């Protein structure tokens, strides 16, 4: 995979950088029953309040039904196509099962069209196969890892990410996550072998503000540029200091350097915090 740069024939193209595998994706029509339209909620909750800032607008999207559970065990599936998914940074692969069923999975790196994948305890540890964690050999890269057995993969699903299985015990396995955190997982939880594809996604450059708006990302305004009524850093004459002992969030909580992770029962499974 390589990076594609553009000649600077406009100011926006000067800084634009894309991953070249974007142009190698399938242009065939995708199965209609594996996608449906969704309404953009622009970062609002059911009360209309903003719960996630800087969201709104953007291109219309259809949500693709991705199989994170891989619960169809023992049935071979052929990789027929690899598609772009606007809802995530990774690409998705279309599987045609031998019994006629079709589904999407997150496309691992180096997964080729025409290869066969399978899930189950007896599956070999090849790229794209899904196995219980206690059946994965030590040192293998894995992604789409379940936190709760049967719930579906929740960990290491972004483009270019992978975790590494570093130890096993009777009921648990020890995994090093992409963040550097070392954590225990139940051995019966499923994971997929390999690293998530589109590995050059983090090297892409947007190039212009308008492309961020296509993605539904609105501008981020500095607190010091606001009025005092809008932000703790706002107000004053000219470029004033923030007037506080430390930076604050828009809601007055301490920012920058304060640990915000809540204490949960699952902290028991964390052997070493992320770096």
UniProtKB/Swiss-Prot annotation:
PROSITE patterns given in the database record: RIBOSOMAL_L2
Gene Ontology biological process terms, A to Z: cytoplasmic translation
SUPFAM superfamilies linked: Nucleic acid-binding proteins, Translation proteins SH3-like domain
Keywords recorded for this protein, A-Z: Chloroplast, Plastid, Ribonucleoprotein, Ribosomal protein
Protein name according to UniProt: Large ribosomal subunit protein uL2c
Domain of life: Eukaryota
Pfam families hit by this protein: Ribosomal_L2 (PF00181), Ribosomal_L2_C (PF03947)
One cellular component (GO) term of this entry: large ribosomal subunit
UniProt GO MF annotations: rRNA binding; structural constituent of ribosome; transferase activity
UniProt gene name: rpl2
Keyword Nucleotide-binding: no
Chain spans, region Disordered: 225-256
Record's subcellular location: Plastid, Chloroplast
Subunit composition and interactions: Part of the 50S ribosomal subunit.
Family: Belongs to the universal ribosomal protein uL2 family.
TM segment ranges: none
Claim: Plastid is one of the keywords in the record: yes
Database matches in NCBIfam families: rplB_bact (TIGR01171)
């Amino acid at each position: 995979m390589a990076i594609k740069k553009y000649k600077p024939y406009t100011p926006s193209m000067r800084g634009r950088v894309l991953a070249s595998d974007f142009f190698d994706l399938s242009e065939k029509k995708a199965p209609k029953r594996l996608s449906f339209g969704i309404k953009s909620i622009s970062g609002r909750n059911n009360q209309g309040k903003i719960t996630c800032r800087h969201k709104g607008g953007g291109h219309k999207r259809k949500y693709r039904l991705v199989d994170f559970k891989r619960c169809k065990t023992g049935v071979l599936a052929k990789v027929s196509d690899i598609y772009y998914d606007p809802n995530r940074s990774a690409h998705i692969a279309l599987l045609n099962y031998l019994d006629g069923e079709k589904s999407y999975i997150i496309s691992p790196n180096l997964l080729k069209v025409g290869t066969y994948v399978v899930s189950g305890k007896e599956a070999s540890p090849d790229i794209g196969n899904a196995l219980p964690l206690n059946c994965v050999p030590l040192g293998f890269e894995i992604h789409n890892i379940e936190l709760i057995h049967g719930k579906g993969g929740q960990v290491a699903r972004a483009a270019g990410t992978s975790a590494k299985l570093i130890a096993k015990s009777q009921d648990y396995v020890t995994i090093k996550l992409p963040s550097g955190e070392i954590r225990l997982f139940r051995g019966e939880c499923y994971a997929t072998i390999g690293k998530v594809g589109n590995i050059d996604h983090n090297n892409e450059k947007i190039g212009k503000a308008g492309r961020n708006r296509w993605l539904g990302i609105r501008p981020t305004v500095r607190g010091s540029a606001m009025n005092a009524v809008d932000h703790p850093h706002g107000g004053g004459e000219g470029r004033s200091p923030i007037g506080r002992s430390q930076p604050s969030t828009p809601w007055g909580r301490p920012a920058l350097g304060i640990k915000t992770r809540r204490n949960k029962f699952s902290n028991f499974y964390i052997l070493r915090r992320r770096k």
